[in-house]
Amino acid sequence: MAASVENRQFSHLEAGLSRSFKPRSDSPVRGCNFPSPNSTNFQKKPNSTIYLDYSSSEDDDDDDEKNEYLQMIKKGNSELEPSVHDTRDEGTADNWIERNFSMIRLTGKHPFNSEPPLNRLMHHGFITPVPLHYVRNHGPVPKGTWDDWTVEVTGLVKRPMKFTMDQLVNEFPCRELPVTLVCAGNRRKEQNMVKQTIGFNWGAAAVSTTIWRGVPLRALLKRCGVFSKNKGALNVCFEGADVLPGGGGSKYGTSIKKEFAMDPARDIIVAYMQNGEKLAPDHGFPVRMIIPGFIGGRMVKWIKRIIVTTQESDSYYHFKDNRVLPPHVDAELANTEAWWYKPEYIINELNINSVITTPCHEEILPINAWTTQRPYTLRGYSYSGGGKKVTRVEVTLDGGETWQVSTLDHPEKPTKYGKYWCWCFWSLEVEVLDLLSAKEIAVRAWDETLNTQPEKLIWNVMGMMNNCWFRVKMNVCKPHKGEIGIVFEHPTQPGNQSGGWMAKERHLEISAEAPQTLKKSISTPFMNTASKMYSMSEVRKHSSADSAWIIVHGHIYDATRFLKDHPGGTDSILINAGTDCTEEFDAIHSDKAKKLLEDFRIGELITTGYTSDSPGNSVHGSSSFSSFLAPIKELVPAQRSVALIPREKIPCKLIDKQSISHDVRKFRFALPSEDQVLGLPVGKHIFLCAVIDDKLCMRAYTPTSTIDEVGYFELVVKIYFKGIHPKFPNGGQMSQYLDSMPLGSFLDVKGPLGHIEYQGKGNFLVHGKQKFAKKLAMIAGGTGITPVYQVMQAILKDPEDDTEMYVVYANRTEDDILLKEELDSWAEKIPERVKVWYVVQDSIKEGWKYSIGFITEAILREHIPEPSHTTLALACGPPPMIQFAVNPNLEKMGYDIKDSLLVF
């Protein structure tokens, strides 16, 4: 081992600072409003040493700029909530790592691949707090200690060596600089909306900038005596410590040309600090590669070996990752024709890119006397690769016919070699009326080599380096009656989150291309030949129980005579009456139901010349734009006391999540306004709506919170994981989606739905008819306990309601019983009015005092009241339970199941 070049003590990591950074007062990232979470204190380590060998100048105000920079790091950290051991990591190899809960997980629970919410990333500006830095992990995070870790330099070098971490810090000069890291898959979800790639759904926040400190790679290679090119030293390979499944089992590895590694202008370092602290586990602790201007995939984390070779890295991940193949090459062709091994398709340097971040997705700009008197400021970020400076960013409001040049903010100074390693920010003021008359906003950037972004997306099998114009769609909406605003839509939302104009367009394309049972040929025997045409305004008039029309795939159906027969109850139709419910219908109905619908078709929708209240309609084509603006009124804050709006979806924010057991979670969702109640009558349910795997998914749930909770509602949900139940190998779509939702994300809610409403003191409204009971036989199976629980909760909350409740609750195992603690508590405190009996298929616990098996006549006779004119049976559970256990056994007891059985 070589001797130390310097003999200095190193008992701690010094709080490193970057080269100078002085944010402009007019920076586009200023003034962004973002709520501050619980703060955590930033601890500045003592004896800070500043290294400025990479500065572009020797300005006297460097110290002031460095101090200002330290304050930026401190401010960023103070606005973060503490990182925690996330329950989603339980049962994985990463359960020891603390992470920020707001990070959006893109690949389920494990491995951890995530990006921050875009607005939160931009709130912090130039420097990203480490917990919000995007993460790309191919597998579990390797565990290692500072004292035991070594980095080996070997291969075509004169003196192969292993260096400890202390040697890397003490024996070499350090280099410290801000670098923007970008995953090559940034904006990949846009590509997946066109055609599925082999990669997961990165949004537009797979980009982050932090301050990195480490040893210049060239210094390590020089110490070891790297051979010359003539002696075969052509490539420098990097190998990490993570053991991965690719290629039958291998380490993550890649390589770069030796000329790059030895070029001082490229600032390549073996890094051990980030933002003045040791590396976080997800970012490569204790040491990793940083290669400015390159894609993140070349910057190997948890670096163990640096090998100088003649050939490129032979790692599976060097060839089967980070390539841009021609659009006609799919995964099968790439494998059969060995496209992976063609050197011309490898990705090294980043390409030019830009993104619109303000307006954010689903932001609504009210149009009123105040907003129209001042410009609206568009904002975003841009970057390029190879150290090239972004020289201009342009915005178009007319599809590229004309462009406006934005104001650029480059917070970094160039290095002494003239390189720019970081993102910059752009801003542009536009008139609100110009926005109102536009269909979309698009942005493109240029760098100093006059590279710019293509107009259209160019698909490739890995979905990498997507840099087409970033487009934000705009539509006129009506937040309140008689008032308008502009709602903005980004192309996608990251991961499996729903939303984005590309998802809507994809859904429409799939609907048009798929074989439609609703679009039958004229020769079809049961073809409804109705050809009458109706306008949207005419359809809207038919939104009541007296006349309920719906639109599905452009066809109009009169569902009035089907209201009473609909399995989901009258409300399920009425909530969509007078609207286009294509998405909702496709999401929850079978092909059989679609065929049945054909009997109710009365005509077709006129698709031109009508206006819709839907945000999906623009004001384009209006013959008199000024007349359209005439009725604009100043918007006022919403004063609604009830959140649910029939026929509309409302966005609700996930604010808390608790694990009750290994597969049961309690979710708390905030309502749109803090002073609202949900507005769900007791006995009814809501639909949760999300786009999962490019399709709208809607599932019914009953909240477990009381109806008068203000500002939020709660759900207790059993998670049906993939690969657990043989009959359902893919698990539950919505429950798994809920489990993967990060705090702070939104879910659409629609309701109220259902044909049963408990009105108090034993009174029910069922299909519009009154029913009364003094005693309730409540039979539930599995998650069907939630509507029963809701009714019980309402009864027990009213001191004047003396209704008696007899609960028989069936589950597969004891562990599957939901809300058991609450049910047992009620039965214990009020035994004269609440009686609870459990039935499980099998019991493995000693002391089980309840029934084992299935619900039988004997069990019901013993634990529910005899039928009478003041007794009603309530049931909710799987259809087989209702059909084979509830209905026949109640009939044997003498219940009139047509009149006295209410099935939720």
UniProtKB/Swiss-Prot annotation:
FAD binds at residues 699-702, 716-721, 728, 733-735, 786. Residues 1-10, 35-50 have a biased composition (Polar residues). Residues 56-65 have a biased composition (Acidic residues). Pfam families: Cyt-b5, FAD_binding_6, Mo-co_dimer, NAD_binding_1, Oxidored_molyb. It is an enzyme of class 1 (oxidoreductase). One of its GO terms (molecular function) is molybdopterin cofactor binding. Binds 1 FAD per subunit. Binds 1 heme group per subunit. Residues 1-65 are annotated as: Disordered. InterPro entries: Cbr1-like_FAD-bd_dom, Cyt_B5-like_heme/steroid-bd, Cyt_B5-like_heme/steroid_sf, Cyt_B5_heme-BS, FAD-bd_FR_type, Flavoprot_Pyr_Nucl_cyt_Rdtase, FNR_nucleotide-bd, Ig_E-set. SMART domains: Cyt-b5. Residues 531-606 form the Cytochrome b5 heme-binding domain. It catalyses: nitrite + NAD(+) + H2O = nitrate + NADH + H(+). Signal peptide: none annotated. Gene3D superfamilies: 2.60.40.650, Cytochrome b5-like heme/steroid binding domain, Nucleotide-binding domain of ferredoxin-NADP reductase (FNR) module, Oxidoreductase, molybdopterin-binding domain, Translation factors. SUPFAM superfamilies: Cytochrome b5-like heme/steroid binding domain, E set domains, Ferredoxin reductase-like, C-terminal NADP-linked domain, Oxidoreductase molybdopterin-binding domain, Riboflavin synthase domain-like. Its cofactor is FAD; heme; Mo-molybdopterin. Mo-molybdopterin binds at C183. Heme binds at H566, H589. Keywords: Disulfide bond, FAD, Flavoprotein, Heme, Iron, Metal-binding, Molybdenum, NAD, Nitrate assimilation, Oxidoreductase. It comes from the Eukaryota. PANTHER family: SULFITE OXIDASE, MITOCHONDRIAL (PTHR19372:SF7), SULFITE REDUCTASE (PTHR19372). Homodimer. Nitrate reductase is a key enzyme involved in the first step of nitrate assimilation in plants, fungi and bacteria. Belongs to the nitrate reductase family. This is Nitrate reductase [NADH] 2. It comes from Nicotiana tabacum (Common tobacco). The gene is NIA2.
